[in-house]
Structure formats: C-alpha cells, structure tokens
Amino acid sequence: MKPAKAKPSGRFFPKSRYEDYVMQLTGIHHLTAISARPKENLSFYAGLLGMRLVKKTVNQDDVSAYHLFYADGEARPGTDLTFFDFPLPPERRGTNSISRTCLRVNGEQSLSFWRDRLKQAGVNVRDIVEVDGRLSLPFEDGEGQRLTLIDDGGAGSASPWAKSSVPAEFQIRGLGPIVLTVHDLARTEDVLTSVMNMRRAREYAAHGARMVVFAMGEGGPAAELHVIEDREQPAARQGAGGVHHVAFRTPDEAQYHAWTQRLNEARIRNSGEIDRFYFRSLYFREPNGILFEIATDGPGFATDEPMATLGEKLALPPFLEPRRAAIEAGLKPLG
C-alpha cells in the first residue's frame, strides 16, 4: 500500500518543494528509557516479560553505564526496548515527555495471560480496557516506567524467542504506539508533518483529553505516535522510570543521509551523523524538547556476535574494544 502524504504547514518547506519529497519513516525503530537498577531491570524485562536480551553493551557516550537492549527472537528493528543504566532519582512526571510506551501482543487471550502473569508477580497492573479501538493493558515496572500491552491483531510478522519464559503465542511482538505529552501540540505537529512526513491520522478521547494520532509509512500500531497536549503540568524532569528518547526507522543509508540533509535545510539543530556500529543515528529535538532519533535498520546486532548467542557477553563496538579491560572493571555485574 502506498502511504499517503502528510499535509505540510509550509513553515519548513514551501509546498512546491515538499511535493518533491517521497521520503518516509517506516515505523518505530527503538525506544530508550532510564533505569537506576539494572539488575532489577534485567529480571523484569528478560525474565518476567520474556524479552530477549539481544545486546549487553555500554552507553557509547558514558562507558560507566550499561546499555541493555531487549527485543524479539531475531533482534529486529522495531522490537528494541533499551535502557541506559543511569543512577538518577525517579523521573518527575510532566509535560514535554514521552509518557507511555506500548508493546504489541496478539489477541485478547494474550492480554488475559499477561494480566494474570503480572498480577501474580505483584506488578502494578490495571484492567484490560479498550483505547482507540484496541484492547490494552496498562502497567508499570518497579521503577514506575509506564507501559501498555496492546492487541495488534496479529498484524505483520513475529519472531518469538525459543528460550523465553513466555509461550510463543503470548510473547511481545514489538513496539508501538508511543505516547507523547507536549505543552504546544501545534509546534510538534508542524515538525511531525512538514519535516518528518507523518500524517495526522485521527483523534480519540483518552483520560479526559484529546489524543491525536500521527502515522508514518504504512501506519498501524508499530508506526504511530499518539500525542496529547497538556498546558497545565510543568515540564517533566528526566530520571529513572522515564524515557530518554524514541527512534524512528529509515531503511538504508541513502535515506539516512537524505534525512540529515532535510533537517539541515529545515534549520533544525541536530547531532550530525553518528555511527553507533549496530545502526547509524541522527538526533534532534522537536519544538517541545523531546529527543528524537532517526536510525537505520542495519547493520544489526549480529554484526559482532552470532545470532544464537546475542547478549550473552559484554559487546563493545570496535572503537571501544581497546578499552575493554578498563570498561569491564568499571561495571557492576548484572548476574
């Protein structure tokens, strides 16, 4: 299905110029959150949630901190929920933040399985409810990370992990949608539609407020942002149990370079192109201050480890390998 074009405001690109662009982000690539308790984090996400630890590495900008990647059985882009190990106080919730992360499962039976499993583990879990036409199950991890399991209707392919503690038919299939809370919706919408080529898909009521859905690529829950405007709360303060950034998928390096050019032409401050070894990254902040990343689908996590043994040892990109002994000495054991 050919994706529909967004309607630009014209603030960043004139309409004639916009019509020349066919670039499309294809969905959520990964989401990176913050944990101050990495051992507990590993037990919750790899143990209770049954996700696969596909990469145990370090924050490339602060090698004293772990960077843990949880994903599906084949470590595919769009399934990665990742955590920085930062010893921070708890997040102060508020606006201008990524306020909820949704994880996709297949069917109401899966949600019932998860409700019972989470309750038995003493997790703060609510009842199954319908939101935006999809059944969902909101819950929080031990640090207050806000999560929701949603029924994606089995859309798209799935890659269960054979060694998971969760039966294959109930395993988490991937990310999305991602919920943002912003002070000024119009400014965020301008960037999402006129720069990032998303389209305003629909609206629905949630928690007594209006939620606006922005879709990318072919759409669907793996390719949506749900944005709520909140002009009452103060801005969130980043901390443990909060989210650091969300990344969006671009299929190859040619489009990745084109996105860099596009941000520069729109005069949006950005990080410039960064090689993260497992993928290429480009960071920038939308107008309300939330950190976005555009990331390539490849090369992937099997670049430096066999697929069969992903996550079993500390992996370091080549430029950090000479410092392995010092880095390992500075990390606390996870197991």
Where are the model-predicted features located?
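Surface-exposed interaction/gating patches
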Residues: E169-H257, N264-N270, E286
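Vicinal oxygen chelate
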Residues: R11-V22, G27-A36, V54-T57, P87-H183, R202-H226, ...
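An N-terminus-focused feature that recognizes amino-terminal "leader" regions
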Residues: Y21-P89, T95-V105, S112, D116-Q120, ...
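Short amphipathic beta-strand starts and helix->beta connectors
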Residues: F84-L88, W161-S164, V227-Q233
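Conserved active-site tyrosine of GNAT-family acetyltransferases
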Residues: N41-A46, L68, L118, G144, ...
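Cationic, low-complexity basic patches in intrinsically disordered or flexible, solvent-exposed regions
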Residues: P3, P8, S16
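Residue-level signal for short segments within beta-strands and strand-turn junctions
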Residues: Y70-D72, D85, D151, E229, ...
